[in-house]
Each structure stands twice: as structure tokens, then as C-alpha cells.
């Protein structure tokens, strides 16, 4: 399979062609993935927050943000600036080290996970062969930060929120991993680029959502629970726990939790688009479109347009899923903590195992359709 163009290798090779020594070229590259991640994730979050406020307003028959910039587009920026300039208070009885480390451990793995997301055709920051495994490993760090934040606050509501968050995250990580494992089994690779390539060539009919409808539902439900979105926002249920593990946080530390929540939502939507909806792939194969227009596939202009539209396609799919997640907030009531854990352990986990066994059986029976 075509592994795509690795941005790291291409960038370093381009600098070496200009006469820059390999060591210097690698040193120049080192901060760039972090900068790209920060810029991309921040812009994604700003769009996500604006969408949430506008869609929530529409659901409640309000106008929503309107006066801060055109259509209220700068309202999320104003929110961010407000949080940055707020006083950062550490409670007198809190553990200052753990209190500070908690938000960092929550937000850092989410940003690092963007490294393995292919945003468009041949556009991935680091194309490593074990991208999915790296994402699962990074996501398992988050519960530690949540529990640390709740425990270090020395507040009963924060502690209960932290315990709930850790229990919820651990409960839904396993079904999430099982649904991803079925995709890995079909594509014979842990690389996100290979998974998208495995779906390409047949347009919308080749997308994994048709071969893995059960896995798609498990992944989406588990992803919403991991992001603590309604109806799974038990760790910070305002009516029960004030603000959960975030109760004692203010200023920039609170902003990190706020940022992490939305970055995680956009990341989950991007991963669903990559794993189940063909990533950058068009609903109609690009070669069919080229033949209809009468343009050769080797045409460099077509390749550039195809790459640009591929990025757009990935983002459209991802933000459609973000729209669904926001809509669910205003249409589904919050579940109880016992119902939430029962759903994870007694329903999603067994169904995930059955889905994995079915995928293995179908792969043996129909190797062409299921990646044998």
C-alpha cells in the first residue's frame, strides 16, 4: 500500500538538498510538529466552540454569539483571552505540585495524538507504522491526570468527580480499543495512512462503516464517553458535583481542561473520519471524476486540487460528527453513573468482543471484502 509522503522525511530531505547538514536539518524540524499541532488544534477548537455556541443557541431558539466579530466568530477568542488573564488560584489545602500536574497530564496526550492523524492525502505529520497503538497508549494517560486533579484539590466534589472521570475513562477505553482492533484486523496495519488507503478505490462503498457498522457505533459511543460529552458528562455534572474535578480550578489551569475537552472532541471526530468514513477519500472515486471531466489522473493540477479537496473532505466529515455530538447534548438526557458503567462493562464490552470475533470469521470467509 502507498504509505503516503511523510512530512518529516520530505522536509529534512528538502533542507539537505539545499546544502544544510543532516543534523541541522533534523534540529530545524524538531519544533515544527509541535507548532503545527498547536496551531491546527487551536484553530479546530475555536471553530468547535463557535459551532457549539451557535448550535446550542439554535436549539434553544436564541441567536447566540453575534457582536464579537462577524457572526460572533471571535467569541471563542474572547473566551480564551478572558481565561488567560484570570487569576490562577491554588487552594490553601491543595497539593500544589499535583494540582498543577493534573491539567498538564490531561491536555498533553491529546495534543500528541494529533501526530498520527492524516489530515489529507499524503499529509501526515509523522507516519509511523504503529499510529493506532500510540493513540491508544496516549489516551490511557488521561485518567491519571483526571484522578490527580480531583485528589489534589482537597475537595469532596473534586475527588468524586476525579474518581468518576477515571472510572468512566477506563470503562470505555476497552470497547474503544476492541472496535479499533477490528479495523486493524481488516486493514492488516496499525498505520492510519494504510487504513485510509485500504478504504480507497471504491468511493463511498469502500468505507469501513459498511463493513463495521457495529464497530462504528461502539467507537462513537465510547469516544463521546471519553470526551465527557452529554449524555456522559457525569464527572462534571453541575447539578450533582458543582463542576467535578474542575471545581477548584481557575485561570489558565481551568483553560487547559476546557481546551482538552474540545481538542479531544475534534480528535475523536477526525479518527472516526479516518477509520470509518474513508478519511480524505471522496464519495465518488477520483479516477471516475477525472474521466467525467476528461482530465488525466497524472495531470499535476488535478493532483494539487485532489490533495486540497482531500483535506477539505476530511474536515467536513469530522465537523459533521462534531455537529452530531453537539446536537446530542440538547436531545439526550444525562444517564446515571450506574447506568453509564453498566453500558460500558455489560453491553459495549461484550458486543465489542462479538464484533471482533465476527470480523475474524468474515475475514476468513470473505478475504477480498474483509482484507484477508
UniProtKB/Swiss-Prot annotation:
NDH-1 is composed of at least 11 different subunits. It is an enzyme of class 7 (translocase). NDH-1 shuttles electrons from an unknown electron donor, via FMN and iron-sulfur (Fe-S) centers, to quinones in the respiratory and/or the photosynthetic chain. The immediate electron acceptor for the enzyme in this species is believed to be plastoquinone. Couples the redox reaction to proton translocation, and thus conserves the redox energy in a proton gradient. It is a multi-pass membrane protein. One of its GO terms (biological process) is photosynthesis, light reaction. This is NAD(P)H-quinone oxidoreductase subunit 1. One of its GO terms (cellular component) is plasma membrane-derived thylakoid membrane. InterPro entries: NADH_UbQ_OxRdtase_su1/FPO, NADH_UbQ_OxRdtase_su1_CS. It holds the Pfam family NADHdh. Its EC number is 7.1.1.-. Its main location: membrane. It catalyses: a plastoquinone + NADH + (n+1) H(+)(in) = a plastoquinol + NAD(+) + n H(+)(out); a plastoquinone + NADPH + (n+1) H(+)(in) = a plastoquinol + NADP(+) + n H(+)(out). The chain crosses the membrane at residues 27-47, 65-85, 97-117, 128-148, 166-186, 204-224, 266-286, 308-328, 347-367. GO terms for molecular function: NADH dehydrogenase activity; oxidoreductase activity, acting on NAD(P)H, quinone or similar compound as acceptor; quinone binding. It is found in: Cellular thylakoid membrane. Keywords: Membrane, NAD, NADP, Plastoquinone, Quinone, Thylakoid, Translocase, Transmembrane, Transmembrane helix.
